[in-house]
């Protein structure tokens, strides 16, 4: 393509600039062949003539279209060159605040110098499992790519992080390791991932330091291998270090620091455990005060030191070793501060024996003070014949001291690294690893020494490996697409590497010079000049003979040779090392041990540090103290680097290049000069150049067709094959066939071709735009002319009409004036005439009226005089009549009073007489007579029988007569005594009763009197209050309106707050349940990992039963504690503690219920004991078994009736008291008379029922006593009399027994009457007390009202009104509340009484029926002994009976092996109903163990099924519905009133009778929560792969989303073949499947709503998180697609009647994000609209979307930085969370509302498919 085609008008180019490196310009005219310059317009409108040389290709770089600016991947740019890369990085960094950008396989990371919220757990989970090209560039994306390739390809991976000091290498490596620790968490409980992360603060403390470029610069290189097992869980790690900068220990440049650990230790020197270190502040030590700045802004060294100690502890470093480490570090500081004094001769030095620092140094290391003092100033020379000790000069001593300090620190550094590796080592077999290389980047300073040379040498090796890997990937891509491939020429830095490491290279010559005894840096430099002066990569500086220049891949670097030899030798005198070996501290001696020193530095298994120095003698007999180590530093580094390269070559590398944007560490400040230097040094531009040499732009045929179809002709579009269309179009558009290639699935373009196509597309649009503008302008002019012509005609028409209307108006006015004059004159004359007539009539009327009134007054006076006379005469006659009548009444009253006194006296005399008592006892005597008659009748029968049998019983006749006489005599005596006693008791009781009646009358009179006075006072007060009622009502209305508004607002706020607190509390509880289930699963996993074999359980129950070992309430508290202890023994302390927590919460309620039940239970046990005792006696005495059972049953029923009667009486007393209280309130307030009378009626009815029940109890007692007497009489019979001779005596005994029985009945009746009299007197006393209490209450109320009235009189009228209104309001409020409480209490008592009465009546009926049946059985026992009675089959009562041994079979058939498909077509939740019917039968039989065992087995069986089918949605939903239904059944039939409101009478009969299963309801509720969470997890796992593809990528609206130039070029390693692409219909189908399954399983509708609310939240979270992390998805068309997809989901919710679930509200953030993408983003009003609309999005999310927003074409403007700043300013007031992404793992707390079933238990039938034939219906 010619230059004239490329450089046309409006084309934008890049030109060099001294300040900004590159500057943008625009051509103002086309370039023509032969032109020597281009006319350009700069951005500031400056016109510039830019010279060009087409022959030498010296033309400005072309600028990419705006549509490509801001791309995620630099290789996606059409024009690939330095200015394009720099500009793209600048735009992303400054305008969008994106610090990560891809450059092919390289991740470019720019240090923002600011904490960004993009590294949280939510971001990690968002990138987990995603393809590298699908998400925005991030270090987590690179880590995920490495993890994914390791798992898929089973090949080791490596991440190489490089860059300048301060560029963020350490932070990037740290975040990569954090990602691996999160997604690859260890399966066992070793916490290896925590240890890997804990190694970072340790290595930062001992290996990082503050430099001029970075406050936390790593001064060593490290390679961390993170090991994984076959399941790709972290099992261990290993660290290798390279080239520690030891010189920093003894020297720091200005404004730099030593290693952090020194300053941290000084900051913590005040701690008690560090007093022996003798440390002070860092400024006091020579080695820490070199740089002049000992602090770092924003860094607390003391806190960092504490973190370092915690990390050492976590990694297993003992406290003693930690103290030893800190002693060694402190000794280095003291060593550097030792004062060395030079002698006069200058050749020797000395150290003062009193030097405090030297003493501290020796004491901290445990060495001899004198020896170290001597050998610091002397050295030993060994020859073949003798040994010399030589003094050293001051400089030599300082160098030796510094060398010793560096060596000590290096050894300590190696020891710490070795122990970290031991802590991270694992015994498990490592399957694969991911290595993270954090190594120094290319460095160049004003003065470059040995360290910079080694660093740049390492970067040369890494760059060579990088180039070969990039080249290989490019070649693989071309081969995959089956296009021709030619070798690309790329930079090969092997010659530079050979210059450094080849034989006789720089390092080889350096080692040779180090071996020379008197070798110098100058001699070495001269050898370099001589050997390599002809090399292209080596140069000699013009002005220096001690420096040399190496031409590296990034830049030319000049090295100063001074110090190279000394640093390469790293000499330490052996005498000093020997002193350290003799230390009394084991750690110090171990650091310098011979075995340790002799180990090779390259041994990766034992020594991972590249800075290892060997100190040993050359010969075993003659020690040479000055002999240097055999292996120099350069050799060691070269060896370790080769090993590293071997490791990296055996892995798949991933590259992260860190860029430092500025040297001032300013946040989000970009310096182009510094950035370009680093881009050139780190290989990014080399990657660009390799890509540009081939075909960097790649398009799929589909995307190319959609993007450039505007360039196609109509006839070309007739072809249906898009691939052929693209080929024909490209051949016509681009003439040079070398500029593009057709691959198998993509089209490959040379650099610049996509930009050319974009230019053609833009030209096409520009031409179309011009055509449209021309047509529109012509149309507008025509419309304008037509509008003007129509306006002119209209104006003329209106003018003519106006003139005609004005003439007509003038004529009308003239005619109207004449009419007005005529009418006015006529009106004036008529008014004058009417005035005269009206005056005449008025005068006549007044005159006539005067005469009429005068006559009327005279007649009226005569009439009134007559009336007065009539009334006076009548009054006189009435007065006389009344006086006579009063006199007659007085006489009559006196006579009647006299007669009444006489009658009273007679009544008193009669009351004292015995006749009265006899009349009272008439009824009693009648009963006695009846009993006597009965006795006489029986005697007659007895006499008749005795006469018939006299022949046989003549010998006993005399005895019988004697017994009869004695019996008669005894009866007479007893009756006489009893009658006298009863008469005396009745007389005393009547006296007391009369006395109580008289007192009651007195109190009633006093009460009536006081009540009358109070009513009068109340009437007066009400009269006064009546005056204030109107004003009160007005004020009340105002107050009510205000209070209503305030209360509504406050109630809404309180409701919201309470709902929020409830949700939080429920969420916390369910999270605890979830954690509990996780701990349970973890426990099972640990148990499974144990050595397999038979393990004996400590109890007879299985281990699974212990999981839900909850006792029922019928057991004692001791049993509960024993069960809890058994749980601790069976399942461990942790789990039992959690179970005990739930148990203790419920135990409080259990105790309260047990206190109430203990009394009844004690009575029951007593009755049972009596019954058992009676049975034993019956067996011993040979009595009938049936008769004894009846007696025991009657005794039990009697006790129950007595207890219930007492309870009923107490309830009636409470009801009476409540009624009396309400009556008192009614008397004081004169309100609610109807309710009072209603309650009295209810009380009367209750009393009547109580009396009836008392009579029934009396009858029952009599019958029971008769049975007892019969049994006692049977026991007293003579056992030795034979049957023939004893029968007559038996008859006699029966006769006597009847008499005694009748006597006891009379006594019992008398006692009953006495009890009734006592009860009545007590009732009267209680009534008197109530009346007194009422009087007192009325008095207090009167006093309060009087005080209130007095206070009111003292106030002003306005205040009185206000005070009165307030008092009235408070009074009415209190009364209303009291009435409500009373009504609720009465209603509750009424329900309770009715229920108890019903139960009482039923039990009485049962007792009567049972007794009648027993008597009938006894009567017909002999007749029916040989007859077989066939029992009629009873109705099904809704219970299922099973044997204990069938429990396992029941659980297996009904739970473990049950498939949901087996129950299709049956009642939903059938297993739950069957289980409840089994529980009900166990309750019916009062079998506590059976209930407990069945419930425990059921719960554990469900858990086992769910664990087995942990990914089966249908099975999980099946058991969720059954567990919830089982829980509802336990509530519905528990007997609690709150759960029985919707039950039918039949259902109430199915309630549990003996057990309270409240604890098990809580266990089932927790199990339901666990099942629900598992259900949500399964559903989310099925939905999540569809969400991103369906919601963001699929085109729901065809043709809406335009295609823009591709972003990241997805590598073949990043993609999985055959990736699924989902559409919205797939989500809808999956939702339909979920809904169908849930409905078929009979799950409660409320739970179904919550399930879909959770699923829609997950859809919202995943979609929004991906939207926030994908630049290609943030466009206007994506917003339209999203809104359409959401509307389809909302329509589905409405179609399924799920729109009330709150699911739509969970989608609100996504809805607002879609609207944000579609809104205008230009003006201030647009910003306000966005802020008001996007209330569910946080500030960070809004800003992130705006930064990511990308136009689809160049005609749409980008969002400006100023607009984003405006949005941020307006949203500053928001208190938004700092989290960018939504928590996709969040689960709403589930609520299981009570949902009773309408089915009755007796209507449920068991299908045969369940194989439950062993269950028996009861």
From Swiss-Prot:
**Region Actin-binding, annotated ranges:** 641-663
List Phosphoserine occurrences by residue: 1416
Q: Which GO terms describe its cellular component?
A: apical cortex; brush border; myosin complex; Schaffer collateral - CA1 synapse
Domain of life, per UniProt, equals Eukaryota
Which GO biological process annotations does it have? endosomal transport; modulation of chemical synaptic transmission; protein transmembrane transport
Q: Residue ranges of region Disordered?
A: 1086-1120, 1161-1188
Annotated Myosin N-terminal SH3-like domain ranges read 8-60
The gene name on file is: Myo5b
IQ domain mapped to chain residues: 765-794, 788-817, 813-842, 836-865, 861-890, 884-913
Which InterPro entries does the protein's record reference? Answer: Dilute_dom, IQ_motif_EF-hand-BS, Kinesin_motor_dom_sf, Myo5b_CBD, Myosin_head_motor_dom-like, Myosin_N, MYSc_Myo5, P-loop_NTPase
Q: Name one Pfam family in it.
A: DIL
Q: Which residues form a coiled coil?
A: 1140-1261, 1313-1415
Domain Dilute: residue ranges: 1496-1773
The UniProt annotation puts the region (Requires for interaction with LIMA1) at: 21-40
Residue ranges annotated for the Myosin motor domain, each copy included:
69-762
Q: Where is the composition biased (Polar residues)?
A: 1098-1118
* Keywords from the named record: Actin-binding, ATP-binding, Calmodulin-binding, Coiled coil, Cytoplasm, Motor protein, Myosin, Nucleotide-binding, Phosphoprotein, Protein transport, Repeat, Transport
Q: Where does ATP bind?
A: 163-170
Outline the subunit composition.
Component of the CART complex, at least composed of ACTN4, HGS/HRS, MYO5B and TRIM3. Interacts with RAB11FIP2. Interacts with RAB11A and RAB8A. Found in a complex with CFTR and RAB11A. Interacts with NPC1L1. Interacts with LIMA1.
The record's subcellular locations are: Cytoplasm
Q: Which family does it belong to?
A: Belongs to the TRAFAC class myosin-kinesin ATPase superfamily. Myosin family.
GO molecular function of the protein, one example? calmodulin binding
Function, please? May be involved in vesicular trafficking via its association with the CART complex. The CART complex is necessary for efficient transferrin receptor recycling but not for EGFR degradation. Required in a complex with RAB11A and RAB11FIP2 for the transport of NPC1L1 to the plasma membrane. Together with RAB11A participates in CFTR trafficking to the plasma membrane and TF (transferrin) recycling in nonpolarized cells. Together with RAB11A and RAB8A participates in epithelial cell polarization. Together with RAB25 regulates transcytosis.
Listed name of the protein? Unconventional myosin-Vb
Q: Show the Gene3D superfamilies listed in the entry.
A: 1.10.10.820, 1.20.5.190, 1.20.58.530, 6.20.240.20, Kinesin motor domain, Myosin VI head, motor domain, U50 subdomain
Q: Cite the SMART domains for this sequence.
A: DIL, IQ, MYSc
From which organism does this entry originate?
Mus musculus (Mouse)
């Amino acid at each position: 393509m010619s230059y004239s085609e490329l450089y046309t008008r409006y084309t934008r180019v890049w030109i060099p600039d001294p300040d900004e490196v590159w500057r943008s310009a625009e051509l103002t005219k086309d370039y023509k062949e032969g032109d020597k310059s281009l006319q350009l317009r700069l951005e500031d409108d400056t016109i510039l003539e830019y010279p060009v040389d087409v022959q030498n290709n010296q033309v400005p770089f072309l600028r990419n279209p705006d549509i490509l600016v801001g791309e995620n991947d630099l290789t996606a740019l059409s024009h690939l060159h330095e200015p394009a890369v720099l500009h793209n990085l600048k735009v992303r960094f400054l305008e969008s605040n994106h610090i990560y950008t891809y450059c092919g396989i390289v991740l470019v990371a720019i240090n923002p110098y600011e904490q960004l919220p993009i590294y949280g757990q939510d971001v990690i989970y968002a990138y987990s499992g995603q393809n590298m090209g699908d998400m925005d560039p991030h270090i987590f994306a690179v880590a995920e790519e490495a993890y994914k390739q390791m798992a898929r390809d089973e090949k080791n991976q490596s991440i190489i992080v490089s860059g300048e000091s301060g560029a963020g290498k350490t932070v990037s490596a740290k975040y990569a390791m954090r990602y691996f620790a999160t997604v690859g968490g260890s399966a066992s409980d070793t916490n290896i991932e925590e240890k890997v992360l804990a190694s970072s603060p340790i290595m930062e403390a001992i290996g990082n330091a503050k430099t001029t470029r970075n406050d936390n610069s790593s001064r060593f290189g490290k390679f961390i291998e993170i090991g994984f097992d076959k399941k790709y869980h972290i099992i261990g790690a290993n660290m290798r270090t390279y080239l520690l900068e030891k010189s920093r220990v003894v020297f720091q440049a200005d404004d730099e620091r030593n290693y952090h650990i020194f300053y941290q230790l000084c900051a913590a020197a005040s701690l008690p455990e560090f007093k022996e270190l003798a440390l002070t502040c860092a400024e006091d030590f020579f080695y820490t005060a070199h740089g002049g700045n000992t602090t770092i802004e924003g860094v607390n060294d003391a806190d960092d030191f504490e973190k370092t100690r915690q990390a050492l502890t976590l990694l297993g470093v003992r406290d003693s070793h930690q103290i030893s480490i800190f002693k060694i570090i402190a000794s280095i500081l003291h060593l550097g501060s030792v004062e060395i004094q030079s002698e006069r001769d200058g050749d020797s030095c000395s150290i003062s024996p009193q030097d405090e620092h030297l003493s501290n140094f020796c004491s901290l290391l445990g060495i001899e003070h004198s020896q170290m003092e001597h050998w610091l100033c002397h050295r030993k020379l060994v020859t073949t014949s003798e040994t010399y000790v030589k003094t050293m000069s001051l400089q030599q001593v300082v160098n030796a001291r510094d060398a010793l300090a560096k060596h000590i620190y290096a050894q300590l550094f190696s020891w710490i690294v070795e122990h970290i590796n031991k802590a991270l080592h694992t015994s498990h077999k490592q399957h694969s690893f991911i290595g993270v290389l954090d190594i120094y980047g290319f460095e160049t300073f004003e003065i470059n020494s040995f360290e910079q040379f080694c660093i740049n040498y390492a970067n040369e090796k890494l760059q060579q490996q990088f180039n070969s890997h990039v080249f290989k990937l490019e070649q693989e891509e071309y081969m995959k697409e089956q296009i021709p491939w030619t070798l690309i020429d790329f930079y090969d830095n092997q010659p530079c590497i050979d210059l450094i490491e080849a034989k006789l290279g720089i390092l080889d010559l350096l080692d040779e010079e180090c071996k020379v005894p008197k070798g110098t840096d100058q001699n070495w430099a001269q050898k370099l000049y001589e050997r390599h002066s002809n090399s292209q990569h080596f140069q000699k500086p013009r002005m220096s003979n001690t420096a040399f220049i190496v031409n590296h891949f990034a830049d030319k670097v000049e090295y100063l040779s001074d110090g190279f030899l000394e640093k390469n030798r790293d000499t330490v005198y052996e005498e000093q090392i020997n002193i350290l070996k003799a230390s009394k501290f084991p750690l110090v001696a171990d650091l310098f041990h011979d075995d340790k020193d002799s180990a090779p530095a390259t041994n990766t298994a034992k020594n991972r540090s590249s800075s290892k120095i060997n100190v040993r003698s050359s010969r075993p007999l003659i020690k040479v103290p000055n002999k240097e180590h055999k292996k120099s530093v350069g050799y060691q580094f070269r060896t370790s680097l080769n090993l590293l390269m071997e490791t990296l070559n055996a892995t798949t590398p991933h590259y992260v290049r860190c860029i430092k944007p500025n040297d001032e560490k300013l946040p989000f400040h970009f310096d182009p000069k510094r950035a370009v230097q680093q881009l050139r040094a780190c290989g990014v531009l080399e990657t660009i150049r390799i890509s540009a040499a081939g075909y960097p732009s790649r398009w799929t045929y589909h995307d190319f067709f959609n993007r450039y179809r505007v360039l196609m002709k109509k006839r070309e579009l007739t072809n249906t094959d898009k691939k052929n269309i693209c080929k024909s179009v490209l051949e016509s558009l681009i003439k040079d066939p070398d500029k593009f290639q057709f691959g198998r699935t993509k089209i490959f373009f040379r650099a610049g071709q996509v930009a050319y196509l974009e230019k053609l597309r833009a030209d096409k649009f520009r031409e179309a735009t011009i055509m449209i503008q021309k047509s529109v302008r012509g149309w507008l002019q025509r419309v304008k002319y037509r509008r003007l012509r129509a306006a002119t005609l209209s104006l003329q028409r209106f003018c003519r009409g106006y003139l005609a209307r004005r003439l007509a108006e003038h004529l009308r006015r003239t005619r109207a004036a004449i009419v007005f004059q005529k009418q006015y004159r006529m009106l004036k004359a008529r008014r004058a005439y009417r005035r005269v007539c009206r005056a005449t009539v008025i005068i006549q009327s007044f005159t006539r009226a005067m005469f009429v009134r005068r006559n009327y007054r005279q007649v009226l006076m005569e009439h009134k005089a007559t009336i007065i006379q009539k009334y006076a005469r009548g009054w006189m006659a009435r007065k006389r009549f009344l006086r006579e009548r009063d006199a007659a009444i007085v006489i009559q009253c006196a006579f009647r009073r006299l007669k009444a006194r006489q009658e009273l006296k007679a009544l008193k005399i009669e009351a004292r007489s015995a006749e009265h008592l006899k009349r009272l006892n008439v009824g009693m005597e009648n009963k006695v007579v009846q009993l006597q008659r009965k006795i006489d009748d029986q005697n007659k029968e007895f006499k008749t029988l005795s006469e018939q049998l006299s022949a046989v019983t003549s010998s006993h006749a005399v005895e019988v007569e004697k017994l009869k006489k004695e019996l008669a005599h005894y009866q007479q005596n007893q009756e006489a005594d009893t009658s006298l006693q009863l008469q005396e008791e009745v007389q005393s009781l009547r006296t007391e009763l009369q006395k109580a009646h008289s007192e009651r009358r007195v109190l009633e009179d006093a009460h009536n009197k006081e009540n009358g006075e109070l009513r009068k006072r109340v009437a007066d007060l009400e009269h006064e209050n009546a005056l204030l009622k109107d004003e009160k009502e007005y004020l009340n209305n105002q107050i009510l309106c205000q209070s209503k508004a305030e209360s509504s607002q406050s109630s809404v706020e309180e409701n919201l707050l309470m709902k929020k607190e409830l949700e939080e509390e429920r969420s916390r509880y369910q999270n605890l349940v979830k954690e509990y289930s996780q701990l349970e699963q973890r426990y099972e996993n640990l148990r499974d990992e144990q050595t397999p074999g038979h393990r004996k359980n400590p109890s007879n129950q299985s281990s699974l039963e212990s999981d839900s070992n909850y006792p029922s309430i019928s057991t004692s508290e001791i049993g509960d504690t024993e069960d809890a202890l058994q749980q601790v023994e069976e399942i461990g302390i942790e789990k039992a503690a959690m179970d005990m927590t739930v148990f203790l919460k419920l135990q409080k309620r259990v105790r309260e219920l047990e206190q109430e039940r203990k009394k009844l239970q004690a009575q029951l046990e007593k009755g049972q004991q009596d019954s058992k005792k009676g049975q034993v006696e019956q067996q011993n005495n040979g009595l009938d078994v049936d008769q004894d059972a009846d007696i025991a049953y009657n005794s039990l029923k009697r006790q129950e009736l007595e207890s219930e009667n007492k309870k009923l009486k107490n309830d009636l007393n409470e009801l009476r008291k409540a009624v009396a209280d309400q009556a008192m309130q009614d008397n004081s307030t004169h309100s609610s008379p109807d309710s009072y009378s209603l309650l009295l009626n209810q009380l009367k009815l209750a009393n009547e029922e109580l009396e009836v029940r008392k009579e029934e109890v009396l009858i029952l007692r009599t019958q029971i006593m008769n049975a007892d007497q019969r049994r006692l009489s049977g026991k007293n019979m003579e056992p030795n009399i034979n049957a023939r001779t004893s029968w007559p005596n038996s008859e006699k005994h029966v006769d006597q027994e009847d008499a005694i029985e009748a006597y006891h009945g009379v006594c019992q009746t008398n006692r009953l009457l006495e009890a009734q009299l006592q009860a009545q007197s007590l009732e009267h006393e209680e009534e008197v007390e109530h009346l007194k209490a009422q009087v007192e209450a009325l008095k207090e109320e009167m006093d309060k009202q009087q005080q209130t009235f007095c206070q009111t009189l003292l106030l002003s009228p306005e205040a009185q009104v206000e005070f009165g209104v307030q008092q009235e309001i408070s009074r009415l409020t209190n009364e209303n509340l009291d009435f409500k409480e009373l009504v609720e209490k009465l209603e509750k008592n009424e329900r309770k009484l009715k229920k108890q009465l019903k139960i009482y009546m039923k039990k009485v009926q049962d007792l009567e029926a049972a007794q009648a049946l027993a008597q009938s059985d006894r009567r017909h026992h002999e007749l029916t002994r040989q007859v077989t009675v066939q029992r009629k089959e009873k109705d099904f009562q809704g219970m299922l009976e099973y044997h204990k041994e069938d429990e396992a079979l029941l659980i297996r058939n009904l739970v473990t092996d049950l498939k949901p498909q087996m129950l299709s077509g049956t009642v939903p939740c059938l297993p739950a109903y069957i289980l409840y019917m089994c529980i009900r039968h166990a309750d019916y039989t009062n079998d506590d163990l059976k209930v407990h065992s069945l419930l425990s087995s059921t719960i554990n069986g469900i858990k086992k099924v769910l664990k087995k089918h942990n990914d089966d949605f249908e099975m999980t939903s099946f058991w969720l519905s059954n567990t919830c239904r089982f829980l509802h059944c336990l509530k519905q039939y528990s007997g609690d009133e709150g759960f029985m409101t919707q039950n039918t009478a039949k259902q109430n009969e199915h309630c549990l009778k003996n057990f309270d299963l409240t604890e098990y309801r809580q266990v089932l509720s927790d199990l339901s929560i666990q099942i629900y969470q598992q259900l949500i997890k399964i559903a989310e796992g099925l939905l999540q792969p569809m969400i991103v593809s369906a919601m963001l990528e699929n085109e729901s609206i065809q043709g809406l989303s335009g295609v823009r130039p591709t972003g990241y070029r997805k590598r073949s390693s990043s993609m999985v073949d055959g990736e699924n692409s989902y559409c919205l219909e797939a989500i809808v189908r999956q939702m339909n499947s979920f809904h169908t399954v849930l409905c078929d399983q009979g799950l409660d509708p409320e739970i179904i709503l919550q399930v879909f609310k959770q699923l829609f939240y997950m859809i919202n979270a995943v979609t929004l998180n991906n939207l926030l992390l994908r630049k290609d998805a943030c466009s206007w068309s994506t917003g339209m697609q999203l809104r359409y997809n959401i509307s389809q989901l909302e329509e589905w919710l409405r179609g399924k009647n799920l729109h009330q679930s709150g699911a739509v509200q969970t989608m609100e953030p996504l809805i607002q994000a879609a609207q944000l993408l579609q809104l205008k983003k230009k003006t201030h009003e647009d910003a306000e609209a966005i802020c008001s609309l996007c209330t569910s999005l946080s500030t960070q999310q809004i800003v992130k979307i705006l930064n990511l927003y990308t136009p689809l074409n160049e005609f749409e403007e980008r969002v400006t930085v100023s607009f984003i700043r405006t949005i941020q300013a307006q949203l500053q007031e928001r208190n938004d969370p700092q989290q960018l992404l939504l928590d996709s793992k969040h689960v709403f707390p589930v609520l299981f509302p009570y949902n009773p079933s309408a089915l009755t238990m007796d209507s449920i039938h068991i299908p045969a498919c369940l194989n439950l034939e062993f269950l028996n219906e009861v």
